[in-house]
């Protein structure tokens, strides 16, 4: 089964509509959060939590400034092959492999705590970053931003800690020898410390998906890329 949806990139968030419900896709969350305890999608009914970390859909929507109905996490996402094309504003879910003429494929690294990561190169160092479709701002450990000029300050939120502000650093990252621009923020210490203990140096979100058409194959744990022209 395969189905494509138009996406609404509200402030960099990956959102689509399914049967009248606004759905935010977030590979950074292990569970799905909804207004009810189930979500019908692609011919299946999936379990939802009504709260995660003490936050429900109403609280998440308020932090975003956008009303969503479902916060789709990895318990649903990992069931599919998913292609995102931000230039065409389209996301495709498939239960079968999706034909994809990629420039390269890299492993998706799955952690014991449910984290989903990939390796990128920043400032000549190969580092592990969380792959987060829900992140409108990418983040990196402050050791990489030392000496970099702050280009602006932006507001962001995390369902676990609420709203916060971060300085933004305009930098570059590379994958498969392809260089792309990234506006990195600085993670709050409460988020940075546990990630670093797992060898994770931040999170890559909107910037990667805006630079490439991306195929996430969670059956084989591979991520494939095509350059957006």
Language-model segments: what does each one mean?
Residues 1-229:
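Pepsin/retropepsin-fold aspartyl endopeptidases
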């Amino acid at each position: 089964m395969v189905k494509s949806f138009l996406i609404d990139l509200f402030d960099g968030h990956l959102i689509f509509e399914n049967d009248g419900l606004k759905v935010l896709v977030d590979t950074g969350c292990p569970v799905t959060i909804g207004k009810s305890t189930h979500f019908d999608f692609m011919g299946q009914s999936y379990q939802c939590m009504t709260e995660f970390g003490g936050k429900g859909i109403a609280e998440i929507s308020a932090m975003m400034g956008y009303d969503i109905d479902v916060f789709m996490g990895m318990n649903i996402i990992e069931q599919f092959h998913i292609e995102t094309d931000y230039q065409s504003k389209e996301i495709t879910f498939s239960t079968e492999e999706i034909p994809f003429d990629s420039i390269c494929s890299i492993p998706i690294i799955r952690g014991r705590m449910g984290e989903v990561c990939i390796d990128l190169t920043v400032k000549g160092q190969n580092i592990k970053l969380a792959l987060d479709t829900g992140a409108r701002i990418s983040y990196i450990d402050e050791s990489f931003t030392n000496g970099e000029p702050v280009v602006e300050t932006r507001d962001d939120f995390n369902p676990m800690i609420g709203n916060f502000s971060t300085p933004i650093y305009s930098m570059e990252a590379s994958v498969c020898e392809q260089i792309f621009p990234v506006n990195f923020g600085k993670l709050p210490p409460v988020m940075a410390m546990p990630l670093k203990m797992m060898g994770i140096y931040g999170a890559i979100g909107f910037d990667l998906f805006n630079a490439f058409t991306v195929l996430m194959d969670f059956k084989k744990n591979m991520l494939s890329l095509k350059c957006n022209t």
